């Protein structure tokens, strides 16, 4: 097979699929599998849409998941109000503010220095596949990197 015919991106997706299966990580397995199907079919025409809106849609779905206990009543209004008087909850609010700030810095860094995106993605996917992490890391990782780089 000629190097010009060799699709490194497909190989990476296949390796990620294998990592997801091996580590029993459904998120990586499903994501890699879906992207392989898109890549090998006419669905590939939707890649620009996924690239432009995928992150926002993912954040919206994640936020819906986080807010569902409030909407369903599983987390009562009384419990929410009491949380403002607990040192653990106040610390959690502070950490949440810090993480949101880091995510904002991460978006700026990834936009201004696209050469680091591949490394951040590889690190995040490896963390998800091998360490059973959750794929919310690239923005936060980029935010932390922006602090390390003094950017």
UniProtKB/Swiss-Prot annotation:
InterPro entries assigned: UPF0756_TM
Protein name from the UniProt record: UPF0756 membrane protein ACIAD2383
Subcellular location: Cell membrane
Family statement: Belongs to the UPF0756 family.
Membrane among keywords: yes
TM ranges: 10-30, 53-73, 84-104, 116-136
Keywords for this protein: Cell membrane, Membrane, Transmembrane, Transmembrane helix
Membrane topology qualifier: Multi-pass membrane protein
Positions in coiled-coil regions: none
Keyword Membrane annotated: yes
GO cellular component: plasma membrane
